[in-house]
C-alpha cells in the first residue's frame, strides 16, 4: 500500500428517486452483500410507511431531523499513556456523525425481530425524529461516556 498521499474521498451519488445524498447514504448503509436494489426497496418502503403515518410531513424532512437528533457530537477514543489506557473524549467530524447516526438507525431497526425491515426502519426513524428510541439512547450513552471521561481531555492528539 502506497504511503505517498491520502486517497481522495469520492462524492456520494444522489439518489435516483429523491435526488438526495442522505437517502443514498442510507441505502448504502442498509445494503448487505452488494444487493442495492433490495436495500432501495427497503428504504423506499420505509418512506412509504412514514408518509402513511404522517401524511402532512415530507419523509425526507423527517429523515433529516431524525439523523440530526441521533448524531453524536462527542465520542471517546482509547489512548495509551504510560502503560494505562484512557478513554479520551474527542469531537466527532461531521462525516462520521452522519455515518454513526445512519448506522445506529439501521442496526437498531435490524435488531427488531419479528417485523419486516422496512417497518422496523420506519419506526426507528420516526422514534429518532421524536427524540426517543434506541438510536437516541445510544447517542446519549456515548455522550455520557465522554462526559464521564472529561478529565482526560488533555490527552487529545
What do these predicted regions represent?
Residues 2-33, 37, 45-157:
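Strongly charged
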Amino acid at each position: 500500500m502506497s504511503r505517498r498521499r491520502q486517497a481522495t474521498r469520492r462524492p456520494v451519488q444522489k439518489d435516483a428517486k429523491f435526488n438526495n445524498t442522505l437517502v443514498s447514504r442510507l441505502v448504502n448503509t442498509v445494503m448487505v452483500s452488494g444487493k442495492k436494489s433490495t436495500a432501495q426497496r427497503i428504504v423506499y418502503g420505509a418512506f412509504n410507511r412514514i408518509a402513511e403515518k404522517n401524511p402532512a410531513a415530507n419523509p425526507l424532512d423527517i429523515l433529516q431531523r431524525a439523523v440530526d437528533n441521533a448524531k453524536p457530537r462527542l465520542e471517546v477514543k482509547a489512548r495509551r499513556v504510560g502503560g494505562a489506557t484512557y478513554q479520551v473524549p474527542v469531537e466527532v467530524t461531521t462525516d462520521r456523525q452522519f455515518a454513526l447516526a445512519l448506522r445506529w438507525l439501521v442496526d437498531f431497526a435490524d435488531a427488531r425481530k419479528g417485523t419486516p425491515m422496512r417497518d422496523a426502519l420506519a419506526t426507528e426513524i420516526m422514534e429518532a425524529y421524536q427524540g426517543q428510541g434506541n438510536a437516541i439512547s445510544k447517542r446519549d450513552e456515548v455522550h455520557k461516556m465522554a462526559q464521564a471521561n472529561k478529565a482526560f481531555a488533555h490527552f487529545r492528539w
